[in-house]
Design a protein with these regions (language model features):
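Acidic, low-complexity intrinsically disordered tails
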Residues: 5-8, 378-383
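Active-site segment of metal-dependent pyrophosphate-handling enzymes
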Residues: 146, 249-251, 301-339
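Short, contiguous pre-domain boundary segments
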Residues: 1-16, 34-35
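N-terminal strand-loop-strand
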Residues: 229-280, 309
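Catalytic cores of DNA base-excision repair glycosylases
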Residues: 25, 29-215, 221-229, 307
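NUDIX/MutT-family hydrolases
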Residues: 332-375
Length: 383
């Protein structure tokens, strides 16, 4: 296997003939191979915007159902803007990266207040909305407003890095500076052709020029692709090496109000931060040399100001976030004394298991709820 040469800072310009050939072959390939997806059937800016946000961190197969349900629940930008944030997060529940939902909601409110509820048509106004970067704005402009704009999401960066054998880390801003002009150079001027080209470029990255095992045998760009010519598909794109991901043990309380085990205490996470605006079972990080039951009791005293009895361990749940991993150690707990105060959360609520379905929880917490629901007669002996 050949290794990449030192990072190239500039690219050899593509001739008009090569550009034309790349456009034509990619669009023809897309017409024959592009998947039929609901957001490709519409030019509605709101629907296109929603799909682009949902697709930022999530696979197409997962997005389709969420996309339909979200549009059914919030059929217009104004209906989204007017909804409480809790309802928006509930619709987003399970899709992850919840800042996307919070930003979508904030942006809808800005559109309602500044643009009379109509999605803006000026590129500068689009890119000024929360949660919309240059590439997402480019996609919305191209797909909904028929304004050809280049795109540069993760899939597109990978395809372009291979096409031109760009051997600089694709996460770096300096690499994007090389790639933006390339994406723009390849884009046709005609709005309809630009729609097809950008859709095709995304499709190529998602289904053919994949991160692992790209299927070069059916790629329309094989003849021009420098990575293919030099057998560098496995080396490109170059990524910045990630630091080892830290792991935290988290003590979590399923905290019952009394021995009838009807109501449980849940906490609303702070707005700004990981999983902001979602509800959770309270708890926190274990300190060095601390037992897990002691961690749960301490966290509840520090964050809620009440004394509890910590009982048996119910379950252990492992979960990975982008920058760290956690193991949730979940304990059956009973309220003892004190007045619950939301010292580290926005709000606290005693709820029954049935009532929990009205609140949005992170995925790992939903697994705790599933466990509790599947064991309705769970009667554990408190220590
Ligand atoms: S030939 Fe292979 S590596 Fe090159 S763009 Fe096509 S799928 Fe990607």
């Amino acid at each position: 296997m050949k290794s990449p040469s030192p990072p190239n800072k500039t690219l050899t310009p593509l001739s008009a003939k090569v550009v034309q050939s790349l456009r034509q072959s990619l669009i023809a390939w897309f017409k024959a191979n592009g998947r039929s997806l609901p957001w490709r059937e519409t030019r509605q800016p709101y629907a296109v915007w929603l799909s682009e946000i949902m697709l930022q961190q999530t696979q197409v197969n997962t997005v389709v159902d969420y996309y339909h349900r979200f549009l059914a629940r919030f059929p217009s930008i104004v209906s989204l803007a007017d909804a409480p944030q809790a309802d928006v997060l509930k619709q987003w529940e399970g899709l992850g990266y919840y800042s996307r939902a919070r930003n979508l909601h904030k942006a809808a409110q800005l559109i309602r207040d500044r643009h009379h509820g109509v999605f803006p048509t000026q590129f500068d106004d689009i890119v000024a909305l929360p949660g919309i970067g240059q590439s997402t704005a480019g996609a919305i402009a191209t797909f909904a407003l028929m304004q050809p704009r280049p795109i540069l999401d993760g899939n597109v960066k990978r395809v372009l890095a291979r096409l031109m054998a760009i051997d600089a880390p694709i996460q770096e801003a300096t690499t994007a500076k090389i790639m933006w002009p390339l994406s723009a150079r390849l884009l046709p001027d005609d709005p309809e052709a630009a729609w097809q080209f950008n859709q095709a470029l995304m499709e190529l990255g998602a289904t053919c020029c994949t991160l692992k095992n790209p299927d070069c045998s059916r790629c329309p760009w094989q003849k021009t692709c420098q990575a293919y010519a030099r057998n560098l598909q496995g080396e490109l794109p170059v990524s910045v090496k990630r630091k080892p991901v830290p792991h935290h043990d988290i003590g979590v309380a399923v905290l019952w109000k009394d021995e009838t085990r009807q109501q449980c205490l849940i906490a609303l996470r702070p707005q700004d931060g990981l999983l902001g605006g979602l509800w959770e079972f309270p708890g926190g990080k274990r300190e060095a040399d601390e037992t897990l039951p002691a961690c749960v009791a301490r966290e509840i005293m520090e964050e809620i100001g009440i004394e509890i009895a910590v009982g048996a361990k119910l379950t252990e749940i492992k979960h990975a976030y982008t920058h760290f991993k956690v193991t949730l150690h979940v304990y059956d707990c009973l309220y003892v004394s004190g007045i619950p105060q939301p010292k580290a959360s926005q709000a606290l609520q005693w709820v029954t298991l049935d009532e929990m379905s009205a609140y949005a929880f992170p995925k790992a917490n939903n697994r705790i709820i599933d466990l509790l629901k599947s064991n309705p007669a769970m009667q554990l002996t408190l220590c």
